[in-house]
Amino acid sequence: MKELLLQLISDILDLSKIEAGTLDFTMDHLDIKSFCEDIMRNYDIKKDKPVPVLLAPGLPEYYIYTDKKRLMQVITNFINNALKFTETGQITLEYHLKENTNEIKFSVTDTGMGIAPEKVDKVFDRFVKLNSFSKGTGLGLSICRSIIEHLGGTIGVESKLGIGSRFWFTHPYTG
């Protein structure tokens, strides 16, 4: 309960800073392949995860100009949410350069329970929880949307009930 309350306070502070335009963004060049490999190492050492968290094989090396801390916040939110709703199968992080655009598309795909069609459009709204049994504040995905929009990208989800979900976002790529 204490952990959930601290997370709620932290999330509300982040949201207020985003709305006020005072959330700090520290921009720098980032090798996204190494960055994603580092994220995977953090999940490799967690023994209590219900399913494997994998990085798609054969991903190319790209550099983007971004805020590493905020990008990590979004990806780990996607993975942690997937872990809450995936009992069998796996969770996969991947990225690719979108054709005919200057964007990298990141995605976290799970083999979890999926999201009911009537709830898909609401997942990035504030205080939305998809069920009553999972821990969380209902603010994480709303914060993710604000971060990605600030970084110049878009965010979305594709889901099939009983099959799984793919949470994705785009990020500008200048080569």
Can you say where each PLM-predicted feature lies in the sequence?
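Short alpha-helical Gxxx[C/S/T] motif in the catalytic ATP-binding
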Residues: 140, 144
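Helix-loop junction within the histidine kinase core
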Residues: 16-27
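Short helix N-cap motif at coil->helix boundaries in the Bergerat
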Residues: 32, 114-122
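Short alpha-helical segment of the dimerization/phosphotransfer core of two-component systems
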Residues: 1-5
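Conserved catalytic submotifs in the C-terminal HATPase_c
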Residues: 26-31, 52-62
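Short helix-loop "hinge" at the ATP-lid/N-box region of the Bergerat-fold HATPase_c
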Residues: 82-83
